[in-house]
Amino acid sequence: MVAKIKSGDLVKVIRGKDRGKEGTVKRVLKDDRLIVEGVQIVKKHVRATQQGQQAGIVSVEAPIHRSNVMVIDPETKQPTRVGVVIKEEARDGKVKTVRVRVAKKSGKELA
């Protein structure tokens, strides 16, 4: 199965307190959550460690569920759904079927 959202994708938040913000996906977690750059910022209290790190309040990005974001179409710059197209490619003298992610609005392949 091909993942609909991968790290490095440009996404837009469609629900929640950060609605309308755009960011790049840093990590995709196993429980259908994403860490998006600049979105879902929370304050975290950090203890001092023995290595000299200071105690204090740090801003970090919290995970957001994948149903609350949409991938931005590279051609139209609008949020779009993601589809999967099966293509046949010749690699090393053999024909292999490959699943490719495609933006539904423009039909353009996603990287």
Curated annotation (Swiss-Prot):
PANTHER family: MITOCHONDRIAL RIBOSOMAL PROTEIN L24
A cellular component term, taken from the record's GO annotations: ribonucleoprotein complex
UniProt-listed Pfam families: KOW, ribosomal_L24
Tagged with keyword RNA-binding: yes
Similarity comment: family membership: Belongs to the universal ribosomal protein uL24 family.
Annotated CDD domains: KOW_RPL26
Primary role: One of two assembly initiator proteins, it binds directly to the 5'-end of the 23S rRNA, where it nucleates assembly of the 50S subunit.
Coiled-coil region list: none
Keyword RNA-binding among record annotations: yes
SUPFAM superfamilies given in the database record: Translation proteins SH3-like domain
UniProt entry keywords in alphabetical sequence: Ribonucleoprotein, Ribosomal protein, RNA-binding, rRNA-binding
Gene Ontology molecular function: rRNA binding; structural constituent of ribosome
Gene name, Swiss-Prot/TrEMBL: rplX
Subunit structure: Part of the 50S ribosomal subunit.
GO biological process, any: translation
Organism of this sequence: Bifidobacterium animalis subsp. lactis (strain AD011)
Domain of life, source organism: Bacteria
InterPro entries on file: KOW (IPR005824), Rib_uL2_dom2 (IPR014722), Ribosomal_uL24 (IPR003256), Ribosomal_uL24_CS (IPR005825), Ribosomal_uL24_KOW (IPR041988), Translation_prot_SH3-like_sf (IPR008991)
Name recorded for this polypeptide: Large ribosomal subunit protein uL24
SMART domains: KOW (SM00739)
